[in-house]
C-alpha cells in the first residue's frame, strides 16, 4: 500500500468512527446533521476533505469538552489539554492516549548515542495544563528514564512583554534558568527538552555539553537557519545533538532529520506523523490551493485519530512546502515562521 493509499484508508476509518451515531461525538454528529450531507458516504479520499470548511479553533473554547468525547469511548475519563490563550477562557483539547502514541514514535527515532536509554531527562518549559508536560515525561519513561521539570508560564511572559515590562521578563527568565542550571549540575541530566530562547539563556551560564547533556530536543515557534546554526555550533559547541521539532497540542509532533541539518545549511524541514496528522502548505490568499514546492504559504493542519478529528485547521504559521524524503515519503514543511512575520511584529515570548 502506498503512503497515499494508506492515508485514504486511515481517513475512511476515522470518518466512519466520528460520524457513526454509535461511536462519534455529539459535536461532529450535530455538525453533519446541520450540514446536510454524510461524510461517511462522500469522503473516500484525502482530497475529499476539501468538502469540509476550515476547522475553527474557537470551537475548542466555546464548546463543552464533553461534546468532543466519542461515544465509542463510553464513560472513560479524559485528559484536558490547553492550547494558546493569554486572557479569557482557553482553548482546550481532550485526549487519552494520542500523546503516548506520538511520543513513542518520536522516541523510537532518537539516537541512543545522544539520548541514552535509561538516561535522566529535564524538561525546561511550559508544563501546567499543557499536553507537553505529560508527553515529555512519557517519552522519558518510554526510553527507560525519569524526568525532572522546571516550569515556565508563557502566558505570563507574553503579558509582561505586551506591557513592556522587560525588566520583569529578565527577572522571570533568570528565575527559570537558575533552576535549570541547578538541575543540570546536580542531577546528571543527559537529555534536555527546552525552547530555543531558554537553551540560549542556559548556555550563558554553563557549558551544556560539558555538564553532561548529550542530546537536546527543542521546540519553538520559529527557528531560522541562522538560529539553528547558532544553537548547534555555538550554544551546544557542536558536541550535543540538536533535534528540532514542530508540534502543538492539536497536532502532536512533526519530526526533522537532525543528521542532515549541516548538509542543508541548517534549514529545518519537518514531516507530520502521517496518517494521524497531515500538514499542507496552502496559498495565503486562496487556501483551497496548495503552493508549489519550495514556495512559502500558510500551514494547514488536519488531525485524524479516534480521539480527535480536526480537518483543515489554518495554523498561525507559514512555511515552505518541501518534498518527501526516503524516511517520510510525504510533503514536509520547512523554515516555519509565525504567520505574517514579515508584515507585523509577533510576540513569541520565551519560545
Language-model region placement:
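Nucleotide 5′-phosphate-binding alpha/beta core
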Residues: 1-82, 88-120, 125-129, 142, ...
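Flexible domain-boundary/linker segments
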Residues: 28-31, 35, 100, 138, ...
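Glycine-centered flexibility sites
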Residues: 24, 36, 85-88, 133, ...
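Active-site glycine/GP-rich loop and adjacent strand/helix microenvironment
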Residues: 1-17, 143-351
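Short, conserved acidic/polar surface loops in the N-terminal third of protein domains
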Residues: 92-96, 132-135, 160-161
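Conserved short alpha-helical elements in the N-terminal third of ANL/AMP-binding
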Residues: 133-147
Amino acid at each position: 500500500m502506498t503512503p497515499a493509499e494508506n492515508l485514504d484508508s486511515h481517513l475512511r476509518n476515522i470518518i466512519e468512527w466520528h460520524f457513526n451515531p454509535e461511536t462519534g461525538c455529539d459535536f461532529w454528529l450535530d455538525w453533519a446533521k446541520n450540514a446536510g450531507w454524510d461524510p461517511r458516504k462522500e469522503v473516500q479520499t484525502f482530497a475529499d476533505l476539501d468538502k469540509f470548511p476550515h476547522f475553527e479553533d474557537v470551537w475548542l473554547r466555546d464548546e463543552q469538552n464533553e461534546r468532543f468525547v466519542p461515544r465509542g469511548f463510553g464513560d472513560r475519563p479524559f485528559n484536558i489539554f490547553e492550547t494558546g490563550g493569554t486572557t479569557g477562557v482557553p482553548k482546550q483539547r481532550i485526549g487519552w492516549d494520542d500523546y503516548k502514541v506520538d511520543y513513542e514514535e518520536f522516541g523510537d527515532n532518537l539516537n541512543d548515542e545522544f539520548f541514552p536509554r535509561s538516561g535522566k531527562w529535564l524538561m525546561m518549559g511550559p508544563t501546567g495544563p499543557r499536553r507537553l508536560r505529560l508527553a515529555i515525561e512519557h517519552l522519558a519513561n518510554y526510553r527507560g528514564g525519569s524526568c525532572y521539570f522546571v516550569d515556565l508560564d508563557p502566558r505570563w511572559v507574553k503579558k509582561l512583554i505586551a506591557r513592556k515590562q522587560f525588566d520583569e521578563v529578565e527577572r522571570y527568565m533568570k528565575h527559570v534558568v537558575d533552576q535549570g542550571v541547578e538541575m543540570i549540575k546536580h542531577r546528571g541530566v543527559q537529555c534536555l527538552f527546552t525552547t530555543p530562547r531558554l537553551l540560549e539563556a542556559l548556555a550563558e551560564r554553563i557549558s551544556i555539553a560539558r555538564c553532561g547533556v548529550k542530546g537536546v530536543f527543542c521546540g519553538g515557534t520559529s527557528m531560522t537557519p541562522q538560529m539553528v546554526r547558532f544553537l548547534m555550533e555555538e550554544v551546544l559547541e557542536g558536541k550535543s545533538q540538536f533535534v528540532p521539532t514542530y508540534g502543538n497540542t492539536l497536532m502532536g509532533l512533526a519530526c526533522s532529520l537532525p543528521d542532515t541539518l549541516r548538509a542543508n545549511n541548517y534549514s529545518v524541514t519537518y514531516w507530520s506523523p502521517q496518517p494521524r496528522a497531515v500538514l499542507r502548505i496552502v496559498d495565503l490568499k486562496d487556501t483551497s490551493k496548495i503552493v508549489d514546492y519550495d514556495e512559502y504559504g500558510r500551514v494547514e493542519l488536519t488531525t485524524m485519530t479516534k480521539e480527535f478529528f480536526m480537518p483543515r485547521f489554518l495554523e498561525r504559521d507559514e512555511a515552505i512546502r518541501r518534498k518527501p524524503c526516503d524516511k517520510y515519503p510525504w510533503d514536509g514543511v520547512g523554515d516555519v515562521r509565525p504567520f505574517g512575520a514579515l508584515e507585523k511584529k509577533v510576540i513569541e515570548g520565551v519560545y
